[in-house]
């Protein structure tokens, strides 16, 4: 619990939060064209680039043809993204690629002069007592955005807690803009049809909808999850190393959110200590 864990695609929901702050502060609009922020790349050989908007990146609708095998060691991820071919014209269908989020990160850096994590620090990390975490970056100082963030489980719980309280912290302080919380976590687009119900309930702004009504999650490879249940005033953070993600989901839904309805259990100091010992030995 005291060791930062790689989040894989859970990083996307953190980047989304930065976009929410930037929108609230009037630094960008979801309808802004991506090329607006990168005029130095206007000579790109891909004319569809001129159609791309911030909203399309958020909802995985750039329809760029990029695979996980593409080189991430290059020094200019923006150039790599803009040079990549299109699978379909932009905004045609849901096509989940992490590079959409790396472009959002690059946009935040371009308009603020700061990396995403530096931009977030005074707005949410410092107020909630979260130490600035490590985030993989490119040669231009852009955080990866869609991957590569390392955070402790407890810090993740702090970060996402406002997402079940309309953006507010436990004391009522507004941390994340309430409008962003509502829009980012509701279904914005249809998602994939891969046979797994957890992936078929719709996608917001870098948040997945759950099969359970009024619930959503941040989601990363190998079982990294933060499940959010506003109705139960609860969230659950998981950090795993399970190659078959569906197994994590299957076990989780076996117990949650049903267990939230059990009420308060009687005090049992021995079992409580056993739980703490188990956590410490993880």
Where do the PLM segments sit?
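A small/polar active-site loop signature that marks catalytic segments
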Residues: 62-137
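Active-site Gly/Thr loop motif
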Residues: 130-132, 182-235
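Active-site helix/loop module of the DD-peptidase/beta-lactamase fold
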Residues: 6, 24-60, 83, 112-147, ...
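Active-site-proximal alpha-helical segments within enzyme catalytic domains
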Residues: 100-107, 147-169, 224-241
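Structural recognition of the beta-strand scaffold that forms the well-ordered cores
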Residues: 8-9, 56-59, 95, 132-135, ...
